[in-house]
Amino acid sequence: MSEYIRVTEDENDEPIEIPSEDDGTVLLSTVTAQFPGACGLRYRNPVSQCMRGVRLVEGILHAPDAGWGNLVYVVNYPKDNKRKMDETDASSAVKVKRAVQKTSDLIVLGLPWKTTEQDLKDYFSTFGEVLMVQVKKDLKTGHSKGFGFVRFTEYETQVKVMSQRHMIDGRWCDCKLPNSKQSPDEPLRSRKVFVGRCTEDMTAEELQQFFCQYGEVVDVFIPKPFRAFAFVTFADDKVAQSLCGEDLIIKGISVHISNAEPKHNSNRQLERSGRFGGNPGGFGNQGGFGNSRGGGAGLGNNQGGNMGGGMNFGAFSINPAMMAAAQAALQSSWGMMGMLASQQNQSGPSGNNQSQGSMQREPNQAFGSGNNSYSGSNSGAPLGWGSASNAGSGSGFNGGFGSSMDSKSSGWGM
């Protein structure tokens, strides 16, 4: 007498009841009729909770010792078939995932200022269906920024558009994936290479014919007027990257191949060379307050009264606001300095000083830079400009605006 046993493809699925033969066995053909590709049955032992196989002899499945009972039997498949099925499912899942990620926004660089979004859509519609176009504009003026974005429906259209340059409203434009689409851990790969050391007799056709031996070439561009270089774009970025750094011979001339993408260098902090007592670049002959050797910051009589617009007082930095304040204080101090200088001219001996002809130089007094003096008299309060190695002598104009190599003093001396 036949009975029905419960069979399923997975323990969590709903089972199917299939009939047994009169002798209590089950034909494998009966199982495969419901589960194509099945090669046997297994069940979970109620005692050990382990999976146990059903005995199969010449296409006939024999019941366990206790009979078929109310157990649920799971279908077995050949391992190769199961592996193929799993790979097929995984491949399908990957294809679906890739299909979602394939199309993305492309950036269009080098757009003419007059190009509108409608112009951009009309142009790219010749390649395929366009989902979105956008021309980036300045928020204040409303004028184009010279670039935009486009997205296509089909990935094949996107690849085709990216593989060539585009003449839009009379100007060559590039269309590519934005850098933000690249993974942070993945280097930016370009299909375009820079060909340096070209000669004027090299034509675009000759370059294309030469580089075709490495891979499909989609574009060759030689700037005009001629500037001894060219750009070659391949269909495959791997071909382009493999050529970077190579020196090739074209028409007997050695050319150098490198990446055509702009290099993203970090911002550099430039050192300002015009400092007090420093290098050229300011008002006067040497660009500093004082001469270039003494490191002082006064009115230097060695260099004819140089007055520079430096940025550093030794280790003390000056920003533009502080510099403006210093200039304002300088202008307001000229009157007082002129009056004091007049008093010094009346009391001090005369000499052949190059900065102020009536003043005598003495090596131990300061107004200026280095070891030179401005006044030969000890009368008058020590006020004024500059400091040098002997700025503390107590006569003339000492203290000062600047810094000294020896005394390390700085500020406005009074």
UniProtKB/Swiss-Prot annotation:
- Outline the extent of the RRM domain: 104-200, 191-262
Which superkingdom?
Eukaryota
Q: What is its main location?
A: nucleus
Per the record, where are the segments of Polar residues compositional bias?
405-414
In terms of Pfam families, this protein maps to: RRM_1, TDP-43_C, TDP-43_N
Q: What SMART domains does its record include?
A: RRM
The entry lists its GO molecular-function terms as: identical protein binding; molecular condensate scaffold activity; mRNA 3'-UTR binding; pre-mRNA intronic binding; RNA binding; RNA polymerase II cis-regulatory region sequence-specific DNA binding
> CDD domains under this entry?
NTD_TDP-43, RRM1_TDP43, RRM2_TDP43
Question: What function does the entry list?
Answer: RNA-binding protein that is involved in various steps of RNA biogenesis and processing. Preferentially binds, via its two RNA recognition motifs RRM1 and RRM2, to GU-repeats on RNA molecules predominantly localized within long introns and in the 3'UTR of mRNAs. In turn, regulates the splicing of many non-coding and protein-coding RNAs including proteins involved in neuronal survival, as well as mRNAs that encode proteins relevant for neurodegenerative diseases. Plays a role in maintaining mitochondrial homeostasis by regulating the processing of mitochondrial transcripts.
Quaternary structure annotation from Swiss-Prot or TrEMBL: Homodimer. Homooligomer (via its N-terminal domain). Interacts with BRDT. Binds specifically to pyrimidine-rich motifs of TAR DNA and to single stranded TG repeated sequences. Binds to RNA, specifically to UG repeated sequences with a minimum of six contiguous repeats. Interacts with ATXN2; the interaction is RNA-dependent. Interacts with MATR3. Interacts with UBQLN2. Interacts with HNRNPA2B1. Interacts with ZNF106. Interacts with CNOT7/CAF1. Interacts with CRY2. Interacts with PPIA/CYPA; the interaction is dependent on RNA-binding activity of TARDBP and PPIase activity of PPIA/CYPA.
What this protein is called in its record is TAR DNA-binding protein 43
Q: Which gene encodes it?
A: Tardbp
